Amino acid sequence: YSHCFLEVGKKLLNPAGIVHGGAIYTLADSGMGAALYSIIGEGELFLTVEANIFYFKAVSSGTLTCESRVVHRGKRIAVMEAEIKNEGELVAKAMGTFSIYKGKKG
């Protein structure tokens, strides 16, 4: 499980004054990665291999929060889920598939 947040500021807004979808996706991907990182074993690393995001509502101010969880963790693949909310209201949902492999950090 992971909980992270992002304060909405002018640098995140597109010309229409709405948070850029890429910023919301980045929050979701980071949150899903943090949730997976909390359960991987010693010597294991991972990377995102596929992700989908669904946007439900535009955001122009406030604080974005991301709650992520592990849906399934296999030997080599993990499926993750993230919900992004603005002031408690659901604005986007993401699902991601991550490849888990043996490797050295850094």
Explain the meaning of each model-derived region:
Residues 6-8, 55, 100:
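Hydrophobic residues in beta-strands and at strand termini
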Residues 19, 33-65, 70:
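Hydrophobic beta-strand-centered segment that forms part of the acyl-chain substrate-binding groove
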Residues 23:
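Amphipathic alpha-helical recognition patches that constitute DNA-binding helices
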Residues 2-4, 49-51, 66, 80, ...:
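Hydrophobic residues positioned within well-ordered beta-strands of beta-sheet architectures
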Residues 1-19:
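Catalytic strand-loop segment that frames the active site of acyl-thioester-processing enzymes
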Residues 59-61, 65, 71-106:
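HotDog/MaoC-like acyl-thioester-processing domains
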